[in-house]
Amino acid sequence: MSSNTVKTVRDGQLTLKDGTGTPVTLVVDFEGEGNFTFSDDKSERLTIMDRGTIVGCRKQNDVVKSASFSVNMRQFTDSGGAGSIIDFIMKTGHYAGNVSTGGAAFGDFYLIDVEFRVEGTDFGDTGDHFANLTKCLASYDFAEGFPDVININLEVYGTITRSQA
């Protein structure tokens, strides 16, 4: 059954996961605007032309997908406590022992998985809605303002899987 309820930023939740057997997780809070975005482009395209007229299209190389979100800045690091979001994505401080989700093929980089859950059952849907992004290389930038903001940027080297459960 399709949903009749439009979802809003109040319905979403982001969870970051490492690659251990029982993943170390961080539920993202203080997201501010709730501006999580992702793109799911599959491959480059080669346009086949015949003297300036499009006559076909072929798949080329896979593309690196992307995602991003912002959080209100509370701290850069917290090595003695619960850790910060920067600690999680950079594998530092409290999260220095985290394991990459990339395996040997991505051994030079620490990758994480990201789960975006949108509440559905509270609105009569048959389940909650999920987008799972795997093998994400995360980076961040900081912007001072009202409030200060940490922007998280993700390069998705794995898959983006959409589901309802």
Stretches found by the model and what they are:
Residues 1-165:
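Signature of extracytoplasmic/envelope-associated structural regions
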